């Protein structure tokens, strides 16, 4: 007789039960994100210049919108590059 495989893989459920990342802005008590603070903004963009998504950084939806606006504003005033040099 055939052996049935378990419906759920226990290794998969253990990997999925990681602790959620906490928003670094909320943890530090930062309410507004300054577009002139390049050191903070560069932590949330890739080496190619793309904005990192929330699921990678753990930023809240509120702060992700503010962060995106600040990065775009910094790009327009030439504080950040639009694309990285290849």
Curated annotation (Swiss-Prot):
This protein's record includes keyword Ribonucleoprotein: yes
Keywords: Ribonucleoprotein, Ribosomal protein, RNA-binding, rRNA-binding
PROSITE patterns in the record: RIBOSOMAL_S18
Keyword NADP: no
InterPro entries for this protein: Ribosomal_bS18, Ribosomal_bS18_CS, Ribosomal_bS18_sf
UniProt-recorded Gene Ontology molecular function terms: small ribosomal subunit rRNA binding; structural constituent of ribosome
GO BP term (any one): translation
GO cellular component: cytosolic small ribosomal subunit
Domain of life: Bacteria
NCBIfam families per UniProt: S18
Role summary: Binds as a heterodimer with protein bS6 to the central domain of the 16S rRNA, where it helps stabilize the platform of the 30S subunit.
Protein family membership: Belongs to the bacterial ribosomal protein bS18 family.
Quaternary structure annotation from Swiss-Prot or TrEMBL: Part of the 30S ribosomal subunit. Forms a tight heterodimer with protein bS6.
Protein name: Small ribosomal subunit protein bS18
